[in-house]
């Protein structure tokens, strides 16, 4: 396990109406990501049609230490079994954002997918995100690759 800087923690604030949902948590000792769950009404699940997108609320806000971000990543099981994934993977939650964390999902499968209250819909991963100095220059140093991209190094 990598060392977490002393005194740092990820703080979650529960939104009203979700006292029954667990705080995001790691499922196993070696898990890199913690589960994010759907905060939708019991009587109003989200039905995600094939090809459709939605914004699923989690019922939590988060405070992330400066210099870090929370990446919102797909759950591999949802992607494999149902074709449901995070549209903007990985989504980024900035350290200064304090609104409700929502997950942008898309159904790439062939059948409707129903998102119910408490379903694990994504995972959060905390990553370093320093703000580097951004400098405009006249020229960039040459590399062997140059401007080659999009398959230029082979398939």
From Swiss-Prot:
Respond yes or no to whether keyword Magnesium is given for this record.
Answer: yes
Q: Which GO terms describe its molecular function?
A: dUTP diphosphatase activity; magnesium ion binding
Leading EC class? hydrolase
> According to its UniProt record, in which pathway does this protein act?
Pyrimidine metabolism; dUMP biosynthesis; dUMP from dCTP (dUTP route): step 2/2
Q: Which reaction does it catalyse?
A: dUTP + H2O = dUMP + diphosphate + H(+)
Q: Which SUPFAM superfamilies match?
A: dUTPase-like (SSF51283)
Keywords, A to Z?
Hydrolase, Magnesium, Metal-binding, Nucleotide metabolism
The family database entries (InterPro entries) matched by this protein are listed as: dUTPase, dUTPase-like, dUTPase-like_sf, dUTPase_trimeric
One annotated GO biological process: dUMP biosynthetic process
Q: Which domain of life is it from?
A: Bacteria
What's the family? Belongs to the dUTPase family.
Which purpose does this protein serve, as stated in its record?
This enzyme is involved in nucleotide metabolism: it produces dUMP, the immediate precursor of thymidine nucleotides and it decreases the intracellular concentration of dUTP so that uracil cannot be incorporated into DNA.
- Which protein is depicted? Deoxyuridine 5'-triphosphate nucleotidohydrolase
Q: Which gene encodes it?
A: dut
